[in-house]
Structure formats: structure tokens, C-alpha cells
Amino acid sequence: MIKDYRNTMLQKLLGFNPKTMTLRTESIAGITTFLTMSYILAVNTSILSSTGMDKGAVFTATALATALSTLLLAFMAKLPLAQAPSMGINAFFAFTLVQGMGYPWQVAMAALFVEGLLFILITFFNVREIVLNSIPATLRYAISVGIGMFIAFIGLKNAGIIVSDPATFVTFGPFTPVSVLALTGILLSGLLVVKQVKGALFYSILICTLIGIPLGVTTIPEGFLPISTPHSLAPTFYQFDFSQLFTLDMAVIIFTLLFFDMFDTIRTFVALDRESTPLNSPH
């Protein structure tokens, strides 16, 4: 009787179907999903903190945004999906807007905030769906590849595997502990993914972190505690600078962010559409 009541509650709250699902399977799937995407906590923090944003605040914000958006998907849409900050738009924000164009991160955050509001509007009025349906399948895959290559290029540059060159634009960098460790991580991640190891990226990050300690790449902060209270959001919370909002340059930036965000979302839809069927059926 208790089991029936539990299944009924889970069915109402999360769309749990006791005929095709078990609590054990769903729990393991949830843990596996966490292990697979937990690298975003470290990567997003590293990318955004390179702009001068407080690292602790960014880490806390990333964790909270991921948890809240995933819970909303579970309870409101009843979809077994996890959501986290995009690994494309954060790189564009940090390396193009802030480091490339020289905008303070507060100004770039204001542009991103306005873009987010516009993105909600075009989603509400089904503009995004119209755009998605009008794009040929081949172009959808090309968008996915293009954004993926952009992220990969930034990763290779940050690791020192490639460096700038006046003649060829980029060339291979020197062998350093950082670049060797990065190459090891890439090969290890690829191997574990091919072997279909659950949590492949998580284990790759963990192993490379441990290898990096004797190499001097990984440093353990003084007074490090494995469990601690979350860092405050205050250094970055609502730190928007709207002083340059009503300028032509900012309008172009907001449009570019909107364009980038839309196609980054399309990239995600294409990937999910190939792996699951609930997105193809009305909900």
C-alpha cells in the first residue's frame, strides 16, 4: 500500500510510470547524469572567473542555476532532463565580449540579461520553434559542429596545445606540464566515452586532477576543506551596468547574443531529438 501511494505521488509530481520505470533505475540514471555533467561546475567557473568575476560566487551561482532549472523541468514539464549553463555562450561572453572587445563583465552581464528577456519573449511567442522548423536538417547539424568547434578551439588555446602565430594564425604550442596533462585528459575522456563508461568526463577530470598534483599543475588551496558552506553570491549578484545599454554597439552585441543563444539551443535540441522521443510528441 505504501509502495502504491509512493508511485501515485511520483506519477503526479514527476510523471513517473510504474509500468515502465522503477525507482532504482531512475535513481541510478539521476546519479549518472550528475556525474556526466558535473564538469560544468568547474569549467563554467573557470571560464567566467577569467573575466574578473568572483570564482566562489560563480561556482555557487552555477550550482544553484543548474539545480533550480533541472527541478523546474522535472516538476513543471515532467521531463527526465537536466539543464545547466551553456558551454557556448559563456565562452562567447568571456573571451569575445570581455577579453576580446574589452567590455567590463558588468556591462556584458547587462547585455546578457536583456538578451535573456528577449529570448523568453521569442520562446513565448513560438518564434524559436518557427526558426527551428525552417532550418534544414543538414544546417542544424552544421550549427552543432560549428559551436562545438568554437568551444574546442578555446579549450585547446587555454591548455596551451595551440598558440597564436603571425604566419599561420595558430600553431602547436610547446610541451609543458599543462599541455601534456590536457592531452592526457582529452585522450582519456575519448577512451572512456567510447567504452561507454558512465560518468566518463567526471572520472577524467578527477584522474587528471590527481595526476596534476605531482606535476605542479593542480594546487591545493591553503585551508582547503572537502565540505564547506557555499560561497556568497553578493560579489556578482545583480551587478549589472546598464550605462551603455542604449548604444548602437550594445544593440549589435545583444542581437549577436540572441542569435548565438538561439542556435546554441537548436544545437541542444538536435542532440536530444536524436536520442529521445518525448520531444517529438506533444506534452
Feature names for model-found ranges:
Residues 28-175:
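Early transmembrane hairpin of solute transport permeases
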Residues 283:
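Histidine-centered active-site/metal-ligand motif
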Residues 73-74, 119, 123, 189, ...:
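Structural signal for membrane-spanning alpha-helices in multi-pass inner-membrane proteins
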Residues 159-182, 186-193, 246-257:
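Entry/N-cap segments of selected transmembrane alpha helices
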Residues 102-106, 195-200:
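Transmembrane helix interruption/hinge and helix-loop junction motifs
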